[in-house]
Amino acid sequence: MKVSCVSTACFFALGFVLHAQMHRAEQDREITYWLQAPQTHQFRISHDFNVTRLGQSSVHSFVRKGSIVSASAIYDLDTGEKLPVHNVTGKAVNALGYYPAPSPDDMVVVQGDLPHPLAAGESARVRVIETYTDPESYRISNGELTWDRTLARPRNTVVLPAGWFLTEVTVPAIISLDPDGRLMLRFNNPRNDEIHVVLKAKHR
């Protein structure tokens, strides 16, 4: 059932939401999407994660089918260094044996190369920043943008383009403003599967 942005099911909190300090591993649970001008069908993504596997020499960001990835950057958050990045296939990643579930062979995967293979007891924390172009999930019609996407992480933040206001959202959200005055929606997902979010907005 759709939830209007003015209904009581859509929680409005004007101001900034402050997070308590969390353990390093727990911070893998967040992702942020910055919607660009809807005519571009683009949104920026940023998320952090840790890797701890002995001997692992690369990290990966798996691109969802239907999205075209560009402007990829992966940073080592312990050193601030930008890692060398390049696109590989799901087949190539499967051959590494890092992940329990295989990816489709033709999947596009952004790979960042670590400075050295991880030693016993060593970990690396990285930040992935990339741009997705996806006309299917992010589009505009009659002056109203639609962003339609499933979200799997426990904490998901979506930031609207500057000057746009929310008209409709299908999942309850905590709404605030970011430091630049852009409308920001925070979706919490307590389940072990995905939530399907469809939001719509218009320009002021």
Predicted regions and their residues:
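Solvent-exposed beta-hairpin/edge-strand motifs
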Residues: 57-95, 148-172
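Hydrophobic residues positioned within well-ordered beta-strands of beta-sheet architectures
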Residues: 29-31, 43-47, 58, 110, ...
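Early extracytoplasmic/domain-onset interaction patches
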Residues: 21-63
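Extracytoplasmic
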Residues: 28, 42-44, 55-57, 69, ...
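Bacterial N-terminal signal peptides
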Residues: 7-17
